[in-house]
Amino acid sequence: RDRYIGGESGSVIKNKDNISVRFAFCFPDTYDIGMSHLGMKILYSLINQRADYWCERVFAPGIDFEKLMRENRIPLYALESLDPLSEFDFIGFTMQYELSYTNVLNMLDLAGIPILSKDRDDKLTNIIVAGGPCVCNPEPLADFIDLFILGEGEEVNLELMDLYKKMKSKDFGKKDFLRRAAEIDGIYVPSLYKVYYNDDGTVKEIIPQDNVRPIIKKRIITVSYTHLRAHETTLHL
């Protein structure tokens, strides 16, 4: 039951009318595997401590349930609200192992969201994010992901959501948001860099575009959990 309709003890339910930013935390594997991941629980808790932010969980369906979803045209949805992924501001994937890469693409397709980032429109919604250990090499997924979080996500997730909240209220587009997001430490936006490859497929050179930073340092948490609980960034647009 929990695998597909939620309702577990400890899940966070909020009133959508009071929410400024919605984050779909996607684990690109089945519920049973994803719910054993401690990192998801930590980030889920941190985001949901903010009254106007709502983090919900999304998992890859089993083969049998995916077949039923496609046959009945049911889009991929979050467990807490049962709302389709296409209604979320952020769609964030945690990349724990390379074998889950194809699940990311399948989940986007099941949600009715264009797989390639270049095929999505410039509306400030459905920001596709990826983080976790595998994004130390983001290039295999660079054509599909809007931005990568390099390093630890406890602080940077909230910084991104704070920026999004400010820019959404001023009617900015997705390209504007990604350009500003690239100024945050630990954020890599593939569309703002040109990557050249050697004949053997290895990276030859990465050239930043539009005067973005040439070197991105991964985020490392150096503050206490108490500070993170109270975290809120101040932004000036």
Where are the regions that the model predicts?
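Short N-terminal or domain-adjacent regulatory/targeting segments
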Residues: 1-18, 71-77
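Residues that mark the start of a beta-strand
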Residues: 20-24
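Residue-level signal for short, function-critical loop segments
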Residues: 27-31, 97
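Low-complexity, highly charged intrinsically disordered N-terminal segments
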Residues: 35, 39-42
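Short helix-loop-beta junction
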Residues: 42-53
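Glycine-rich beta-alpha loop elements in corrinoid/cobalamin-binding modules
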Residues: 60-210
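Conserved small/polar residues in nucleotide/adenosyl-binding loops
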Residues: 226-233
